[in-house]
Swiss-Prot record:
Pyridoxal 5'-phosphate binds at N146, G253, T254, G255, G256, T257, S346. Heme binds at C49, H62. It is an enzyme of class 4 (lyase). Residues 22-39 have a biased composition (Basic and acidic residues). This is Cystathionine beta-synthase. GO terms for cellular component: cytoplasm; cytosol; nucleus. It comes from Rattus norvegicus.
């Protein structure tokens, strides 16, 4: 892939895999303790790539690979990365009324179960080739999980220490696989901005600065990311389709997959239309109007970001579509039940968009969809009916016999006014309050009453014992944002589903609030004054536990006798 050589700050030439590059000016921040500098490189730095359509390969400064056939006996499992199958989609295509041929590139057949195996191996081998990564070194990577699994897999085979930093949102299946591969795992708050020191990116850079001979391969900036798809994935697609591809549909996370494949297809199939998929709540799509939504969170993992990664070349995408959780999980389940493809949620995102975008294609034309990962990582999520019901993605079957209380509303419970805590209260004081009142958890709210998160006695005590916080630290440092909200109008059946998985649920109601009265999204941050613009805020009504539900049912049972 023709690309300009990026210049490091010390003047040496190299690509992002030259990992000892110094942060650019403006990227040093004072720490909370005073003059301590925060050393990091932002994952959205401007790209220096000079790839242009039509520019000869000889101009490329990069090392390029050529797809090879696998031997009958593989020397190690890393040779099982790549050469994934192309499968015709039959029933979904027919039901959608498509005239064109719909094909799926099944990336979950890679050794580690996802498309990210390709870039993980490529980043490591390019760093080894450059002499940056040496035996005994440590690999650190901020990731949503799949890149981490790919890196941990390669590190296990090659003998590197591997530390993976990922948000709390990501599934426990990913955590379990990473641990089994020998990786060390650090979890970070899901809602932390990418440029926050508490984000998965920020924590990874802090670890890199503390651990000798450690490297962040940096999938967000590393040219090896799109190169893996330019050299291999795209060539496989062209070979499997005999050079005939009329449309490609791919979701975007770091953007390396869609960038690398699109650049090669634009060179070899000039008429091929590239369709990008970006979830609602992410900002990767263009034009910018597509990203305007009140939604900031989504359940689908591995795609979408709140920044534009360096490796994403949006110029090669002809059109963007926004995906949503409902369609994504519905189509992921359809791919499993109707096509037998055991894929993950982001595969559903891509397929949901593909059946819309491919409506414009005619008979004899061909649409290829990238299915990024497998269902293995989501057994407790969208594959679970309970999880789908709890999240509101499925409706209860009315024909199923339920207890007498199942369809009663949450408002039937006699909930007392909740104990709430301000984010500036210390951990020590909060623990004392919870113990005095006999509570295990409490909502943390700002001065106007909007919910910032939850704090639990167990989480605070474990954080104190692990040395992550001090007793004098503000409680906002141990904030838990993965709470399950429920409304007064929701059923006790829905509450029951939540309490099967969690110790408590937060009963909330929405309130329209002027922004000059509310704090910003940063926990413990200053007042966000924005010309009185109004927005919806979640306000706490009460906290309900399994004991509350059992007491209600038991009391009503007595009166029913």
């Amino acid at each position: 892939m023709p690309s300009g050589t990026s210049q490091c700050e010390d003047g040496s030439a190299g690509c992002p895999q030259d990992l000892e590059v110094q942060p650019e000016k403006g990227q040093l921040e004072k720490g909370a303790s005073g003059d301590k500098e925060r050393v990091w490189i932002s994952p959205d730095t401007p790209s220096r790539c000079t790839w242009q359509l039509g520019r000869p390969m000889a101009d490329s400064p990069h090392y390029h690979t050529v797809p090879t056939k696998s031997p009958k006996i593989l020397p190690d499992i890393l040779r099982k990365i790549g050469n994934t199958p192309m499968v015709r989609i039959n029933r979904i295509s027919k039901n959608a009324g498509l005239k064109c041929e719909l094909l799926a590139k099944c990336e979950f057949f890679n050794a580690g179960g996802s498309v990210k195996d390709r870039i993980s191996l490529r980043m490591i081998e390019d760093a080894e080739r450059a002499g940056t990564l040496k035996p005994g070194d440590t690999i650190i990577e901020p990731t949503s999980g799949n890149t981490g699994i790919g890196l941990a897999l390669a590190a296990a085979v090659k003998g590197y220490r591997c530390i993976i930093v990922m948000p709390e949102k990501m599934s426990m299946e990913k955590v379990d696989v990473l641990r089994a591969l020998g990786a060390e795992i650090v979890r970070t708050p899901t809602n932390a901005r990418f440029d926050s020191p508490e984000s998965h990116v920020g924590v990874a850079w802090r670890l890199k600065n503390e651990i000798p001979n450690s490297h962040i391969l940096d999938q967000y900036r590393n040219a090896s990311n799109p190169l893996a798809h330019y050299d291999d994935t795209a060539e496989e697609i062209l070979q499997q389709c005999d050079g005939k591809v009329d449309m490609l549909v791919a979701s975007a996370g770091t953007g390396g997959t869609i960038t690398g494949i699109a650049r090669k297809l634009k060179e070899k199939c000039p008429g091929c239309k590239i369709i990008g998929v970006d979830p609602e709540g992410s900002i990767l799509a263009e034009p910018e109007e597509l990203n305007q939504t009140e939604q900031t969170a989504y359940e689908v993992e591995g795609i979408g970001y709140d920044f534009i990664p360096t490796v994403l070349d949006r110029a090669v995408v002809d059109r963007w579509f926004k995906s949503n959780d409902d369609d994504s999980f519905a189509f992921a389940r359809m791919l499993i039940s109707q096509e037998g493809l055991l894929c993950g949620g982001s595969s559903g995102s891509a397929m949901a968009v593909a059946v819309k975008a491919a409506q414009e294609l005619k008979e004899g034309q061909r649409c290829v969809v990238i299915l990024p990962d497998s269902v293995r990582n989501y057994m407790s999520k969208f594959l679970s009916d309970k999880w789908m019901l709890q999240k509101g993605f499925m409706k209860e079957e009315l024909s199923v016999k339920r207890p007498w209380w199942w369809h009663l509303r949450v408002q039937e419970l006699s909930l007392s006014a909740p104990l709430t805590v301000l984010p500036t209260v210390t951990c020590e004081h909060t623990i004392a309050i919870l113990r005095e009142k006999g509570f295990d958890q409490a909502p943390v709210v700002n001065e106007s009453g909007a919910i910032l998160g939850m704090v639990t006695l167990g989480n605070m005590l474990s954080s104190l014992l692990a040395g992550k916080v001090r007793p004098s630290d503000e409680v906002c440092k141990v904030l838990y944002k993965q709470f399950k909200p429920i409304h007064l109008t929701d059923t006790l059946g829905m509450l029951s589903h939540i309490l099967e998985m969690d110790h408590f649920a937060l009963v909330v109601h929405e309130q329209i609030q002027s922004r000059d009265q509310a704090w910003s999204g940063v926990v413990g941050g200053p007042t966000d004054r924005n010309n009185g613009v109004s927005s919806k805020q979640l306000m706490v009504f009460g906290v309900v536990t399994a004991i509350d539900l059992l007491n209600f049912v038991a009391a009503r049972e007595q009166t029913r006798k």
